Amino acid sequence: MAAPSGRSQSSLHRKGLMAADRRSRILAVCGMHPDHQETLKKNRVVLAKQLLLSELLEHLLEKDIITLEMRELIQAKGGSFSQNVELLNLLPKRGPQAFDAFCEALRETRQGHLEDLLLTTLSDIQHVLPPLSCDYDTSLPFSVCESCPPHKQLRLSTDATEHSLDNGDGPPCLLVKPCTPEFYQAHYQLAYRLQSQPRGLALVLSNVHFTGEKDLEFRSGGDVDHTTLVTLFKLLGYNVHVLHDQTAQEMQEKLQNFAQLPAHRVTDSCVVALLSHGVEGGIYGVDGKLLQLQEVFRLFDNANCPSLQNKPKMFFIQACRGDETDRGVDQQDGKNHTQSPGCEESDAGKEELMKMRLPTRSDMICGYACLKGNAAMRNTKRGSWYIEALTQVFSERACDMHVADMLVKVNALIKEREGYAPGTEFHRCKEMSEYCSTLCQQLYLFPGYPPT
């Protein structure tokens, strides 16, 4: 066979370079985020020792993270440790969605403690998130499940598609505006002290998968709320702790452990966010048993949590407080409000309403997704109305507005929303959030100030 000519060799070389360039560009688009890779690396030994793969691999296969050939390659390794190592070698090469899908699979296979470990590490790594392009959309395709009024609709960029709006992969755009030195100097003397680094500890507890005899459904969209809040609190300067799918007893025990952490002594505030099904005065564990909110507040009161005495404590409750859907009333001579097209669901439990008293505590403020007796609305793709509004307001106005006033703005956003789910009880439904406060001073979060 004749040797290739110089021209042929040059052509082959160019084609090889083009192919390499294509592979490079594909990896740039499809590779795992560096923070996710670093998170897996930092927990590699623990994961290699503790992962239980038999069911986990099926979940990853279903999510198109691994192929049948990859599953066979992993299973061909001798011993669980070697199999786990092989999976950990593959994951960083399986695209930008692989980390989130892996975390979800851990949760679905009752390995939530490993997911918590990964998310806590990720929060520690992401001290400062780079700003993302963010603007507001004025029109949305009908296929989007739920939206704010058009002028409030967040999107990724000017050419965002409908998939980027409701794929549930996390907050579409989140950037907290920093407080200016001038604003801080003008307000800090009349407000709670908020200067510690971190500002305080934050706990985000999200129950999504329920078992037991209660008729409590999977909280589709709950993962979006969790991811959004973890990101928001991190950007506001908090050290975030995460918990998933806890029984009522586990919630009580872990909330108590969180309240007793020594770090509260040297920080200036505390945040607790609880996301679950609920009734008036209580929230459900994944076992269908109730944890009374009275008990939650008791754990952080002045008697039981002296480390937080005279410090502001913020609570956010995304759960129903009853099972009544607010049908709303016609507004006299009112403007036509844009509907919120969506796959609406309710966080109400399917049992008789339980009445529980809510105690008054000092230096606390608690935001509720809905009024007493009512159900809270949650979109199966975008997450709950309340958490979406809370995130929008806090990211935009924490720089120049105190928390109580921000919660008033959250109320205003929730008031404008209207469900869109033709043929269901949630079509044209309404929701009204509220808050109660025993704060004794103005509570400014002063994001980004003083500079670290």
UniProtKB/Swiss-Prot annotation:
Positions bearing Phosphoserine: S157, S340
Gene: Casp2
Stored SUPFAM superfamilies: Caspase-like (SSF52129), DEATH domain (SSF47986)
GO function terms (MF aspect): cysteine-type endopeptidase activity; identical protein binding; protein domain specific binding
Enzyme superclass (EC): hydrolase
Residue stretches making up the CARD domain: 32-121
Keywords: Acetylation, Apoptosis, Hydrolase, Phosphoprotein, Protease, Thiol protease, Zymogen
Modification type N-acetylalanine: residues: A2
Cross-referenced Gene3D superfamilies: 3.40.50.1460, Caspase-like (3.30.70.1470), Death Domain, Fas (1.10.533.10)
Positions of region (Disordered): 327-349
PTM per Swiss-Prot/TrEMBL: The mature protease can process its own propeptide, but not that of other caspases.
EC number: 3.4.22.55
Upper classification of the organism: Eukaryota, Metazoa, Chordata, Craniata, Vertebrata
Protein name per its UniProtKB record: Caspase-2
GO cellular component term, pick one: cytoplasm
Catalytic activity: Strict requirement for an Asp residue at P1, with 316-Asp being essential for proteolytic activity and has a preferred cleavage sequence of Val-Asp-Val-Ala-Asp-|-
Basic and acidic residues bias (residue ranges): 327-336
Assembly with partners or alone: Heterotetramer that consists of two anti-parallel arranged heterodimers, each one formed by a p18 subunit and a p12 subunit. Forms a complex named the PIDDosome with PIDD1 and CRADD. Interacts with NOL3 (via CARD domain); inhibits CASP2 activity in a phosphorylation-dependent manner.
